[in-house]
Amino acid sequence: MKTIVLIACVKEKQSNPCKAIDLYQGKDFTNWVSYSKKINADKIYILSGKHGLLNPDEIIEPYDFNLNNANKEYKKKWSDLVLFKLSKETNLKKDNYILLCNDIYAENLLSQIKNYSFPFKIK
């Protein structure tokens, strides 16, 4: 069983294309990355409202989109894409998932992820 951390994107971003782990600049995001490293997570992914599931080293351009404001259909398609990608790289039934995101990012993921926790209350 591996420890997988899913970190939500944040509004504050670099102004140029760069690695996803470097794109997001908010204090919360940097604290969540530090926490993920402190607990020795086996894998860290970023939940992007626009791009779905991102590997930290993926190069992406800055964008302005918030999943919290998306309609129900978009959120369902988004979560299906995230779960599909996760199922290719992790074990949805056995791995332990630590979610560093709000309920909106998590709501459609939890039906398929069996072992999960929310160590922090995130709005």
Located regions from the model:
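Peripheral peptide segments
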Residues: 1-123
